[in-house]
Amino acid sequence: MSYTPRNVLVTGGAGFIGANYVRWLLGEDAGVHIVNLDALTYAGSTDNLKGLPGEGRHTFVQGDICDAALVARLLREHAIDTVVHFAAESHVDRSISGPGEFVRTNVVGTYTLLEACRQYWLIEQQLPRTTAASGRRFHHISTDEVYGTLGREDPAFTECTPYAPNSPYSASKAGSDHLVRAYFHTYGLPVTTTNCSNNYGPLQHAEKFIPTVIRSCLEGRNIPVYGDGSNIRDWLYVEDHCRGIERVIRRGRLGETYNIGGCNEWKNLDIVRLICRLLDERRPEAAPHDRLISFVTDRPGHDWRYAI
């Protein structure tokens, strides 16, 4: 059975994946109205929202997903029928040095949103499970990092892979995933979840792996590579991710989790060398860029391989 969102609250919609989703959805569906709630931390920017298609159908609100009163007001004022929850602290290195903010945003923030939706949809509007299931959606975006790490010969993650998070970041996302599941089974809140592999594409923050490599090359600085660079990631283009999310929102089974991967595994060092070769072609005067590769001490708990 197909579901059609109309008044959508997007959290974290000024960040990398969220802003790409907002732009893509406004361009794809002329009937959708988006309320975009973002705290505008270091990783989000309204610059990511310039020149949106259907800009009159987009309302930006700067605010914190942990602000229960604000979230409740937005749900009521805009008659929100769909929540798409991107907002999260997501940089693993930052979670190692400061895990508290990850627990607050990723766990408490998700709880705040779930509880606000429960109060508005199921209590104030008195929608029973069957009605809520046909007319409301809470979609939660998560990560494949909740599954832990894979060995070289291990099969890729599936939706049945046990959770085994190894960093404060992935542990906080695992906690949020379990809360979403609990609100479905306990209260009948109409939820779906997607767990994605590593994203790349336009608007990605400079601290992330691929932008760091490109920026280091352009500035002639050392390219930091953890350990020996043999760690493997499954890369997913951000717009493909957006399409997958929307497919799940519209056609996914309530209470289910869906993995979205790129089937595109690369060693970190091979990604670095590929970028260096491409920049050698475009900036031959600075070649060879791979002379900038600098192996650095591996980070604690660095998962070796992800694959979906």
Task: Give, region by region, the residue ranges found by the protein language model.
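C-terminal substrate-binding subdomain of Rossmann-fold SDR/epimerase-dehydratase oxidoreductases
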Residues: 5, 20, 24, 28, ...
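Conserved acidic
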Residues: 164-168, 205, 233
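Hydrophobic alpha-helical transmembrane segments of integral membrane proteins
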Residues: 161, 207-208
